[in-house]
Design a protein with these regions (language model features):
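Charged, alpha-helix-forming regions
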Residues: 1-418
Length: 418
């Protein structure tokens, strides 16, 4: 008999609805314009990640949350710090009278409930309703059946499952730390101070003789918005002579290059679009704006893209790519959009970007250093996510084993051995 068999042998449970044992409430909307990029407390709303940060909180640490509305509705999380709960998320807090009635330890019972809800996450996400913004109803949450076990069994289940979640969290933290380390060195290498220093060392010049000068991107490159032939369905083609039609879905996660497209448009359609050449840059001008990509193919872009071209005599492609991904530039885009009435990254804003004008040989030196950092990071990102995925699957396996009970017999159902 396995340890799980032994732990759950003849375990009797009592079933309660989540709404009977927990306070389930939505948060309060906070004006997005008043949020900060860095602040004391995260704002948890309908998404998976914080919407921003503020210096106020309305929920204490160690609280379960469930996203109520939006694409991530039904996502279950556990916040270990104080936070602000927005209007598009629920908090799930055990009732004190239940804790007292069953003699539960609050910490273990709270984590037990988290694991129960995490097991129900897919069902919650599948229950989303609404033609506009999909949402999970409070009634759906209230109706989730929760097995109330003995204190001893509950504690052992939580300790077992938390070992897996803690390990996954540690791996994710390590991956994040490696990424931040790379970003730190990238931004340092691209700073004006470092470019001055490396140019002085490279050419044996005094700083005053070789000082980095800045111009705007619009002065040394062509920046344009894409264009869409309409209706686009009229111009989609399977013809081998068709022009690749570049869409956001054609680009892989964390990709640097656009290598292929799922669709092509006719030559006639391309005349009403913007045709780019291999080596040109594109950036999304709305939603997740400002992320650069290098074309590894010729293609046409719609009006959700901006293009950067005709810069190769002055700028090295890899140097430009790293510069555009830097925190300094990404922060520049945010500042321009937040301080104006526009809600997207238009061509005028892109043209206004200050950019260092340095010798191309020096650009290539910086780019090669960053290539090495990027390669090391890619190796790390290749290994750690695999380990995270493996541990996550182990957690889900044991969670199903430990939390699957038979409602009719009020005893644990366990038919598999490990």
């Amino acid at each position: 008999m396995s340890k799980i068999d032994e732990l759950l042998k003849n375990e009797k449970v009592e079933w309660k609805k989540l709404g009977d044992i927990c306070e389930i409430t939505k948060g309060k909307q906070y004006n997005k314009r008043d949020m900060q990029e860095y602040g004391t407390y995260p704002v948890i709303n309908g998404g998976i990640l914080p919407s921003g940060y503020i210096d106020l909180f309305n929920r204490n640490e160690n609280t379960i949350t469930v996203s109520q509305g939006g694409a991530s509705a039904g996502f279950v999380n556990f916040l270990k710090e104080k936070f602000w709960l927005g209007a598009h998320a629920y908090s799930v807090i055990p009732k004190n009278e239940i804790i007292k009635e069953y003699g539960y330890n609050y910490i273990y019972f709270n984590r037990f409930l988290y694991h129960i809800l995490k097991m129900n996450q897919i069902n919650l996400q599948d229950s989303k309703e609404g033609a506009g913004i999909p949402s999970v109803s409070k009634d759906k949450l209230n109706s989730i059946q929760v097995p109330l076990t003995s204190i001893e069994t509950q504690e052992k289940i939580v300790k077992t499952l938390d070992k897996f979640t803690n390990y996954v969290t540690e791996l994710q933290a390590e991956l994040q730390a490696r990424t931040k380390q790379y970003e730190y060195y990238r931004d340092m290498l691209l700073s004006e101070e470092y470019l001055n220093k490396i140019s002085t060392k490279m050419y044996g010049l005094e700083c005053k003789d070789y000082e980095v000068k800045f111009t705007t991107l619009g002065e040394i490159a062509q920046v344009n918005r894409g264009a869409s032939p309409r209706p686009i369905t009229k111009y989609i083609t399977d013809d081998i002579e068709g022009i690749p039609w570049i869409k956001i879905g054609d680009i892989g996660v964390n990709s640097k290059y656009v290598t292929k497209t799922a669709q092509k448009i006719t030559i006639e359609g391309a005349k009403n679009s913007r045709i780019l050449k291999k080596g040109d840059f594109i950036m999304s001008n709305s939603m997740s704006y400002g992320r650069p990509y290098i074309l590894d193919i010729d293609g046409a872009i719609h009006d959700g893209w901006a293009s950067i071209s005709d810069f190769h005599n002055i700028l090295d492609s890899d140097f430009l790519y790293y510069y555009l991904t830097s925190y300094k530039v990404q922060n520049y885009w945010k500042g321009k959009i937040n301080s104006s009435s526009v809600s997207n990254l238009n061509s005028e804003i892109i043209r206004s970007l200050p950019i260092p004008v340095i010798d191309k040989e020096l650009q290539q030196v910086v780019a090669k250093i960053l290539d090495k950092f990027q390669s090391l990071l890619a190796d790390t990102k290749g290994l750690l996510p695999q380990e995270i995925e493996q541990r996550q699957k182990q957690y889900e396996y044991y969670r199903e084993k430990l939390l699957t009970f038979n409602e009719n017999s009020a005893k644990h159902t366990h038919t598999h051995t490990i």
